[in-house]
Amino acid sequence: MYNLSKKNKKLLIIFLVVFISISSLSLISTEYYFMSPGPPYQWDIEYESIDNYEFEGNLYQLTVRRDEANALIYAWSYVSNSVDLYPREVILPKGVSPEELSQISIQNMKTSENVAIAVALKYLGYDITSKGEGVSVVGILDDSPVKDALKRGDLLNSINNDEISSVSEFIAMLRTYDIGDTVKIGLIRDVDGSLKNLEIQTKLIEHVEYEGEPMVGFLATTANERFDFPFEIDIKTGNVGGPSAGLMMALNVYNNLIPNDITNSLVIAGTGTIEIDGSVGPVGGVKQKVIAAKRAGAELILVPTANFEEAKPMETDSTNIVAIDSFEEALKVISEYSSR
């Protein structure tokens, strides 16, 4: 039988105390969500009935890991520059379960995928049509000015009498207004089995994640959105959710459908939502995404203009961070950078 020395016994006791303490912290829940760098993705895309081309470089989509923070992660966030905390109600509206939030995120990714494909094909000269049946309310933030006026299941169809048929159109229209503006929202609500046309008025507030960006304050999906594509394109997104991959999905599709590789074998990474008009919008977790890009060896990082001030200080001699507002501008930046 092996006998421990007094010194080794003390070390063993210290180790056990630390191990038990850390294990205990991991079992304690908090009222926060955390965000940390996720893996960069180079999308696997399948095409049917159309010539496509592989490319030598990388067009990485940047991701974050977002989940409920236990006490261990909560403590770790105070010593790590790559982990941020958010109050639970900012991420998870009242009445929405984590499982529902995950499904909403996956659905938003699917919508983003279709919009990205549409943007890339339009730029290549294809005539693309899309149509949804309105903006479906799936959750309402506690601090939203419409928390008593909107209900889950409401179907929004206009802003100030201008029709909207999708979340993409809704966001694009909101960006034509300023924070503090009052807007009139038209909607359809199921009242005791009967559909009623209603209107509400609300002031736009600042987005909880994107500084300077107006919002109403609810989670949404597009009801029955349909795209008419000339051929089938399937982006293998797996379990990645959210709308922030739009820009990079559009760039990947575009680069696969032209014979000349826009990357020129460079490692390029980026993030940004994309709307049907090609405009690029802000994202959350840009700090974590830039960290992930640098870890992947990215030479050029594309970020939405709205996120540029946060991202710019992280630039190094070997990594250039560039602000972009549109798909077309992203192509121009990549072309200029890859031709150096």
Region spans (language model):
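PDZ-domain C-terminal substructure recognizer with occasional recognition of PDZ-binding tails
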Residues: 124, 171-218, 313-329, 333-339
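PDZ/PDZ-like domain segments forming the peptide/carboxylate-binding groove
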Residues: 111, 117-158, 162-167, 279-284, ...
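C-terminal, low-ordered peptide segments at domain boundaries
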Residues: 190-252
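Terminal peptide-recognition signature
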Residues: 121, 146, 153-156, 160, ...
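Extracytoplasmic/periplasmic/luminal assembly and interaction segments
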Residues: 53-103
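Hydrophobic membrane-insertion alpha-helices, especially the h-region
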Residues: 10-29
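Second-shell loop/turn segments in exported
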Residues: 100-111, 142, 157-160, 233-243, ...
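Glycine- and Gly-Pro-enriched alpha-helical subdomains that act as flexible
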Residues: 256, 268, 276-301
